[in-house]
Amino acid sequence: MINVLINKSSKLVNGVDSCINNKTIRLFCSSSSTNQVNKTPFNLCIIGSGPAGLYTAAKVHRQIPHANITILEKLPYPFGLVRSGISPDHQNEKKVKNTLEKVLLEHPHQIQFIGNVDIEKDIKFQYIKDNFHAVVLACGIEGDKKLGIPGELTLKNVYFAREFIGWLNGNLKDQHKQFDLSNENLAIVGQGNVALDVARLLLKKNSDELKKTDITSTSFDKINKSNVKNIHIIGRRGPLEVSFTNKEIREILTLQNVNTFINDISTLDVSEEDVSKLERAKKRTFELFKQHLKPFDQEIANNGNMNLIFHFLRSPVELLDKYGSSSGSGDGMVLSKIKLEKNKLIIDEKTQQKKAIGSGEFEIIECSSLFRSIGYTGTKQFPSVPFDFNSVSIPNKYGKVLEEPNSDKFINGLYVSGWLKGGPSGSIPNISANSEETASIIHQDYESNQFINNNNNNDGGHNSITSLLQPNHKIINFNDYKKIESEEVKRGKEKGKLLEKIIVFDELKNIINNS
């Protein structure tokens, strides 16, 4: 019997049975009471090969060993954000790739990877549903949040932080991006770890440590040649409300040859009562700010080091060119300055939580490139699948998709895992637990035959994918990926680094065909 922890002890709905004991849902009550083994054919398609998809595959395989699981991936390689979203200088975090890879290595007949398949573009989602008993959506969240201010869409050199990290990591879909690092002043809007990733990597200019990672040589060379000297991290909230984790904030505040400043020292003046209400980790974050952030000093800033300047309680309200315009007309199409509004925190009457509102006071800082890292809006990726833009997730109960938000009616055979299930946040361990819950619901539905296709035969499934694609479409299986990886490791050794990622798709195809 498998126990899955959840936040509340309400019963599953619409025929999904369970036994409930306080905060623990004990699933499979009926199936655990019999010694009979269900051998009904089961073809499962998982869309997305990141941690959510692979963890779900492993946990379903453990519970339904004879299941045929096909994992579809838009990119030509697996592992999702582990390969393309974790900062190159955080190799310890990337080691989870070894665990994920075992899912594909140890069960090659039951769990099969097919890369370079873009749903709707290469194959219709409806065809997937027609050829599998069940489908799990585990491909993450698309759609970065915009600032929604004048100049954001009209001036050049305004980017998303996530694209920059993908570019550094050799993610194919980000290689066409051009990032201007030719000027001294750069700003990052956001108070989460991705904002720190961008700043930290730029501050590690000429770092041998960074050079030896899996960062692409192209992007490493560009960072080394950059003229960036002053990096501004801007956030609408105060130092007590940031989303930085202690490990990341400590790392960036203790970098060698970096001056760490705060633009407005008064923003660190917070009441002892407010500090006392913080969780332990948040208290430590605030202590780190007080310990390392000094009032901006121009003389120190000119000492040859790079400068990191934190701006708390500030919101960008307009992006300006060198003429002070946000229209982007004529030769003034390039970002030059940011207009910021000073904020103050008030208690929201509805939520009783602090929120930042503008004070009507403004200031302007020099800035020639801007990275946005303020969250995700989400996009509706699949026809006929509902999407809740408020929670930035697909509405579901314990991983089974609902017909609409707050509904009590399920869509049989359709499941969700990872960020699409719970919203765009959560560590790898959280995603593992998230996937466990989804796998449990799939197992229970398998026992009761509540799927898209209830036919008890083994038609369709993995073997149907190639027939549904165009004849000349290049699919990439796991053996193909291992050829790519082998070549990347070889090229990396030649350069004295972990690996050298291949960033041109045609080159990937040639490696596969000629190996």
UniProtKB/Swiss-Prot annotation:
Main location as per UniProt: mitochondrion
EC number(s) from the headed UniProt entry: 1.18.1.6
Disulfide bonds listed in the record: none
Pfam families, A to Z: Pyr_redox_2
Compartments, record wording: Mitochondrion inner membrane
Family named by the database record: Belongs to the ferredoxin--NADP reductase type 1 family.
Protein name stated in the entry: Probable NADPH:adrenodoxin oxidoreductase, mitochondrial
Species per Swiss-Prot/TrEMBL record: Dictyostelium discoideum
Gene name per UniProt: fdxr
